[in-house]
Amino acid sequence: MRDKTGPKFGPYQPDDEAVSPSRRRLILGMGMVSGALVLGGAKTAQAADCRSPDVAGTQDERWQKQPFYGQHQAGVLTPQQAAMMLVAFDVLATDKTSLIRLFKLLTERLAFLTTGGRAPSVNAKLPPLDSGIMGPEIYPDNLTVTVSVGNALFDERFGLQGQKPLRLQRMTRFPNDSLDAGLCHGDVMLQICANTNETVIHALRDIIKHTPDLLSVRWKREGFISAHAARSKGQDTPINLLGFKDGTANPKISNKPLINNVVWVSNNAGEPAWAVGGSYQVVRIIRFKVEFWDRTPLQEQQTIFGRDKNSGAPLGMQHEHDEPNYAKDPEGKVIPMDAHIRLANPRTIETQRNLMLRRGYSYSLGVSNSGQLDMGLLFVCYQSDLAQAFLTVQERLNGEALEEYVKPIGGGYFFTLPGVADANHYLAQSLLEA
């Protein structure tokens, strides 16, 4: 018998997806003042020559870098870095011209931050142009900043209604959700990842400093995976805070035809032309009832997931990446019918179209007001079709045994922009000039 006592969560509170006009005006006014201070300083520094020093025959991790330019943005197929932050913003821009300025500025800053360089110096009577938390040298540190846009950006403010991706929608409540209005939605979502927390925080502060009249933080959450998993560059599956491997069934990045089908919007998808090369991003903040879970017998934990806790192998099998054969277990005697892995991926020809690429991170925020540990999973996944992938899978998962131990409290649906071809282009250019 499972202990039914566990953390209590408040009811879902309906909220407006976009920031209210009055709040936007207030923040905009504040931003223009601070923006004047920033613009009074020196121009943006040019990226320095970031040659990799020879450190004991291996590259210093601080100098690791991911390409900024390309058909797709980095941070989707990139092997997971150790540190991550999700930051949702409300856009303060009031017209399309200002919105274009925002995305050009984001492109400029991200190109610099992901390359690295020397922090610029200014007159000491002016605010410094860099926070200084990384010292005088800004290392790339494997930084990626993946930019996505929310459903609300396609409202009447910028005249983009006709360019909205077909499947993009406001995240609605599932039966087990207890959504906090302050942790949902956003006009722009940044997924910031790097080797270290310092680099992630530095990137966020740089972006905020340079966009005071254009962006306002709506909510943020910081996540992590083990250093061992990060250094494996995708070879070792991260372990979540319930003690189980998370992401075992991901499609292999090396299988390019499969990845192109699962992750990226293609020319024949019926989407707006600008969206080709982008991806639908799902973000879910999922709180774990870890005290409750830690009192649950191991056998029950394993039947809930359908996997061995140590090896990650499907029950009745030996290795993590062994594929379960549900046809030989039609009554669920080995892997229960309501096991997480069986519901999420039934392994049929029909359900192959429901695949997605997961890129989740753990989070830990201290304790709740009731004295319970506030920790869980920052679930992030990418797919070429939101309805066919995440939404379909989540419908199958409704009512699963795992729901007793987890509670989604926030997040949103976003569209990850196509990549930037080169230094002559900018993020969202094909959308804004469509």
UniProtKB/Swiss-Prot annotation:
Its main location: periplasm. The gene is efeB. Belongs to the DyP-type peroxidase family. EfeB subfamily. Pfam families: Dyp_perox_C, Dyp_perox_N. Its cofactor is heme b. This is Deferrochelatase. Its EC number is 4.98.1.1, 1.11.1.-. Predicted to be exported by the Tat system. The position of the signal peptide cleavage has not been experimentally proven. Keywords: Heme, Iron, Lyase, Metal-binding, Oxidoreductase, Periplasm, Peroxidase, Signal. One of its GO terms (biological process) is iron import into cell. One of its GO terms (cellular component) is periplasmic space.
